[in-house]
Regions:
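Glycine-rich phosphate-binding P-loop
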Residues: 6-20
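Pre-Walker A (Motif I) flank of P-loop NTPase domains
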Residues: 1-9, 94
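RNA pseudouridine synthases
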Residues: 103-109
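Small-molecule kinase domains that catalyze NTP-dependent phosphoryl transfer to phosphate-bearing small molecules
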Residues: 58-65, 77, 136-181
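Short, amphipathic alpha-helical "lid/cap" segments that border enzyme active or binding sites
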Residues: 84, 180-188
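Conserved phosphate-donor/acceptor-positioning beta-strand/loop module used by diverse small-molecule
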Residues: 109-131, 137-147
């Protein structure tokens, strides 16, 4: 059975960067934007649609709960099924790091999975999204709250689990306190000790 690292993260915490650094240290693939591309190929949906709909419930939890599910699966439901299949197939290929997309839930019974959650305080994340992503559309703090709220709603909707809740992960790390590189080192060391 393959050893997989899943990284869930707050927006702006550097989880994607941590995942890439861990993969580099361990010499294994990291799936983030590559995962979006694979899901888009399998589903026939545009990458931008997969990026948005594949991680967020449109309009939040309530509107999704009240959507047209009575008429059959929604595009989001179809995308969820394809996403789960693609994640499972990647995990079967060999050890890897998978960032986001509820991979921790998808792989909970299918792989030896080290489940990680990366978080940081609001000031660290706000500064980071301005510096790294050039976010300037609205206040960085509001953008962080909105993205995190949508991620949490999506995670709860499809997994019935609380996103970011420490008991749902093997380890949670504060990238603002520890730094991106130290988080990557800790995860890589923990992975090696479990292999």
């Amino acid at each position: 059975m393959n050893h997989i690292i899943t990284i869930s993260r707050e927006f702006g915490s550097g989880g994607r960067t941590v995942g890439k650094k861990v993969a580099e240290q361990l010499g294994i693939p990291c799936y983030d934007s590559e995962l979006i591309q694979k899901i888009a190929e399998e589903s026939g949906f545009a990458e931008n649609y997969v990026k948005e709909a594949g991680e967020y419930t449109p309009g939040g939890f309530l509107s999704s709960a009240l959507s047209n599910r009575a008429f059959g699966p929604t595009n989001e439901d179809i995308l969820w099924e394809i996403q789960c299949r693609v994640i499972s197939e990647l995990a079967e290929k060999g050890p890897c790091v998978i960032v986001g997309r509820c991979a921790d839930y998808t792989l909970q019974d299918k792989a030896k999975c080290l489940k990680v959650f990366i978080h940081a305080d609001m000031a660290f994340r706000a500064k980071r999204i301005v510096e790294v992503y050039g976010e300037r559309e609205q206040s960085p703090e509001q953008r962080l709250r909105d993205k995190d709220k949508r991620r949490a709603a999506y995670h709860r909707f499809y997994t019935n689990m609380k996103w970011g809740y420490a008991q749902n992960y093997h380890i949670t790390l504060d990238s603002g306190e520890l730094g991106i590189d130290k988080c990557a080192d800790i995860i890589a060391d923990l992975y090696k000790s479990r292999a």
